[in-house]
Swiss-Prot record:
Enzyme class: transferase
Binding site for ADP: A153, V154, S155, R156, A157, G158, K159, T160
Single GO MF descriptor: phosphotransferase activity, phosphate group as acceptor
EC number from the UniProt entry: 2.7.11.33, 2.7.4.28
Family indicated by similarity: Belongs to the pyruvate, phosphate/water dikinase regulatory protein family. PSRP subfamily.
Its job: Bifunctional serine/threonine kinase and phosphorylase involved in the regulation of the phosphoenolpyruvate synthase (PEPS) by catalyzing its phosphorylation/dephosphorylation.
Descriptive protein name: Putative phosphoenolpyruvate synthase regulatory protein
Pfam families: Kinase-PPPase
UniProt keyword list: Kinase, Nucleotide-binding, Serine/threonine-protein kinase, Transferase
Origin organism lineage: Bacteria, Pseudomonadati, Pseudomonadota, Gammaproteobacteria, Lysobacterales
């Protein structure tokens, strides 16, 4: 039996919703080589027929039934896509009818509402948070009074991508502070962070994984040496424990999970954009 399986994320909008849900589903299955493709803005019958042809062709190529994760809100488009012979996983269908019964109201099919511009206030909060994250990345700026959270970690432990995710998806003003050699030698919380204890969250990482990441950045250097990575991680973890700073290992944790843990631990209540 072939382990290759073509998977299509099909949407009449950006496709972000279909891909996010589809990816979460696929991670529950191991031993398969999922060949994925996103088809966005399939918003009329002609585009749907073209998409169905692509899906059908992939099935013939790999000699297996394709999977379509579909977030098109128009039932007619979904019917055309189903003509491809693929396994259809409709993102909305299982929930619409129960919601209509519960709310005693019919749905109004609207394309792209999940990821459209909600309002200018939300938009500006998102942009301002992103600008804040970039200007406070890796200790560039140290004025943390306006920060919602300050991520603390050794270099290359996942601070920057987590800050950007928090800014883009939650409008969180996230700064990050890299632990320097001087900080690690003292093994105490850096003085510039002491007034912001309630905003601190530590990130740690497996030393071997850290070495792999640093080798890509600066190979065969003291910075990427195994001993350096082991020492820095060990000191950082002791510091977090001694200073009672909540922390999380990023080694086998997705950015989404890290961000969710940061928000819940620090009690930051924000809706996802």
């Amino acid at each position: 039996m072939s382990t290759i399986r073509p998977v299509f994320y099909v949407s009449d909008g950006t496709g972000i919703t279909a891909e996010t849900i589809g990816h979460s589903l696929l991670t529950q299955f191991s031993g398969f080589n999922f060949v994925t493709d996103r088809m966005s803005f399939i918003d009329d019958a002609e585009k749907a027929r073209d998409a169905a042809m692509r899906v059908r062709a992939a099935g013939e190529r790999y000699q297996v039934r394709p999977v379509v994760v579909n977030s098109c809100v128009d039932p007619q488009l979904s019917m055309i896509l189903a003509e491809s012979g693929a396994l259809m996983l409709d993102v909305f269908a299982p929930f619409i009818e129960p919601l209509e019964r519960e709310l005693n109201a019919p749905r109004h099919s609207r394309v792209g509402r999940a990821h459209g511009m909600v309002d200018f206030e939300t938009y500006h909060r998102r942009i301002n948070a992103m600008n804040f994250a970039l200007s406070h990345d890796d200790g560039i700026a140290l004025n943390y009074d306006e920060a919602d959270v300050i991520l603390v970690a050794v270099s290359r432990a996942g601070k920057t991508p987590t800050c950007i995710y928090l800014a883009l998806h939650y409008g969180i003003r996230a700064a990050n502070y890299p632990l320097t050699d001087e900080d690690l030698e003292n093994e105490r919380l850096p003085p510039r962070l002491r007034n912001y204890r309630s905003k601190l969250f530590g990130l740690t990482i497996d030393p071997e994984r850290l070495q792999q990441i640093r080798q890509e950045r600066r190979a065969n250097s003291r910075y990427s040496a195994a001993e350096t990575c082991r020492r820095e991680v060990a000191i950082a973890e002791r510091m977090f424990q001694m200073e009672r700073i909540p922390s999380l290992s990023t080694t086998n944790t997705s950015i989404e999970e890290i961000s969710s843990k940061v928000l819940s631990t620090l009690g930051l209540q924000r809706e996802m954009f």
